[in-house]
């Protein structure tokens, strides 16, 4: 009661004992809104303002007349309601109005642009032909220029020292990559050439040479070259057919022939040398010759008959 007496003090003590005093206190308690968690924030923000207005109105208004009391209570209610409307309008207005919404969108876009601009962007430098020429000249001299050289080069090319340093780093990386690639290609070509020669298909040249030697009419020659046989060797060693006239005709060492042509002897001896050197280096060819004795005898007999026929025709033509 002391709080109420201090808050709602009246001018005359006689009015305190009347019934009107208690009615006035109850009305003020009903109009005052206390703090409550369930009440909205806008109502909580303006309770003291309504109380102050109500108390000031009570103090200023005369309490002798009852009409003044009825006038005071609606005034406080209207002020509190007006404060609530102002609060709610402040809270609802940004969402409902169109221009305010566009302003908020613009602010959001600006914030996003500021965030994106804060990120570090990498700019690609485009060099001119003159700048590249200057840089390449220095790179041919040294791959690792010092700070002084980089600064001088930056002044000549109108670039920053950092750009020049980055260019040299990229150029060194490119040079190392090319060197590595060149070494790999060189190794590949070397091994490819080595293995390609070894993997070539081998033709059966020895069998063809042996067949041409034994079956051809003009291919009758010794198996062993005359250049590789000593002069003192017997006729059985120098020629496989010591009793045939072909040995004398081709000019073996054991059977010299004075009537032979010089050019024919040279031609036949060279052919015999190359053919016999190939045959002598192959063991398979010797095995082939040893396993076909009947074929050799037949070919030798045919060759002897042909040579006899040639000699007969030559003698007839000479006699005529």
Swiss-Prot record:
Keywords: Activator, Developmental protein, DNA-binding, Homeobox, Nucleus, Repressor, Transcription, Transcription regulation. GO terms for molecular function: DNA-binding transcription activator activity, RNA polymerase II-specific; RNA polymerase II transcription regulatory region sequence-specific DNA binding. It is found in: Nucleus. The keyword Transferase does not apply. GO terms for biological process: camera-type eye morphogenesis; embryonic cranial skeleton morphogenesis; embryonic neurocranium morphogenesis; embryonic skeletal system morphogenesis; negative regulation of DNA-templated transcription; neural crest cell migration; positive regulation of DNA-templated transcription; positive regulation of epithelial to mesenchymal transition. Disruption phenotype: Morpholino-mediated knockdown causes severe craniofacial alterations including small, misshapen head, microphthalmia and loss of the jaw. It is associated with a more or less severe loss of the cartilaginous facial skeleton. Pericardial edema is also detected. Residues 120-179 bind DNA. A motif (OAR) lies at residues 300-313. Signal peptide: none annotated. Belongs to the paired homeobox family. Binds DNA as a homodimer; required for transcriptional activation. The OAR motif may negatively regulate DNA-binding and therefore transcriptional activity. It is found in the C-terminal transactivation domain that stimulates transcription. Sequence-specific DNA-binding transcription factor that binds palindromic sequences within promoters and may activate or repress the transcription of a subset of genes. Most probably regulates the expression of genes involved in the development of mesenchyme-derived craniofacial structures. Required for proper neural crest cell migration into the frontonasal primordia during development. This is ALX homeobox protein 1. It comes from Danio rerio (Zebrafish). The gene is alx1.
């Amino acid at each position: 009661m002391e709080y109420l007496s201090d808050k709602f003090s009246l001018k005359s003590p006689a009015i305190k004992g009347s019934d009107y005093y208690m009615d006035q206190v109850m009305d003020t308690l009903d109009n005052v809104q206390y703090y409550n968690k369930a009440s909205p924030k806008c109502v909580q923000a303006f309770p003291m303002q309504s109380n102050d207005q109500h108390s000031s109105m009570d103090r200023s208004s005369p309490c002798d007349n009852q009409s003044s009391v009825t006038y005071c209570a609606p005034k406080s209610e209207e002020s509190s309601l007006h404060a609530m409307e102002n609060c709610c309008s402040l809270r609802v207005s940004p969402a409902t109005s169109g221009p305010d919404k566009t302003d908020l969108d613009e602010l959001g876009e600006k914030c996003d642009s500021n965030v994106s601009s804060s990120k570090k962007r990498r700019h690609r430098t485009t060099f001119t032909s003159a700048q590249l020429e200057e840089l390449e000249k220095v790179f041919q001299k040294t791959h690792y220029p010092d700070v002084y050289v980089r600064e001088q080069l930056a002044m000549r090319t109108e670039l920053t020292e950092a750009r020049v340093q980055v260019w040299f780093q990229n150029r060194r990386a490119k040079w190392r990559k090319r060197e590595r690639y060149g070494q790999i290609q060189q190794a590949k070509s070397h091994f490819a050439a080595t293995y390609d020669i070894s993997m070539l298909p081998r033709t059966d040249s020895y069998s063809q040479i042996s067949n041409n030697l034994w079956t051809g009419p003009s291919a009758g020659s010794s198996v062993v070259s005359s250049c590789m046989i000593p002069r003192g060797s017997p006729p059985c060693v120098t020629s496989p057919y010591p009793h045939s006239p072909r040995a004398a005709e081709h000019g073996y060492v054991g059977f010299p022939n004075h009537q032979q042509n010089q050019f024919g002897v040279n031609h036949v001896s060279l052919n015999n040398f190359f053919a016999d050197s190939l045959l002598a280096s192959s063991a398979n060819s010797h095995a082939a010759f040893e396993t076909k004795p009947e074929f050799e005898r037949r070919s030798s007999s045919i060759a002897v008959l042909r040579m006899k026929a040639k000699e007969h025709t030559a003698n007839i033509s000479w006699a005529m």
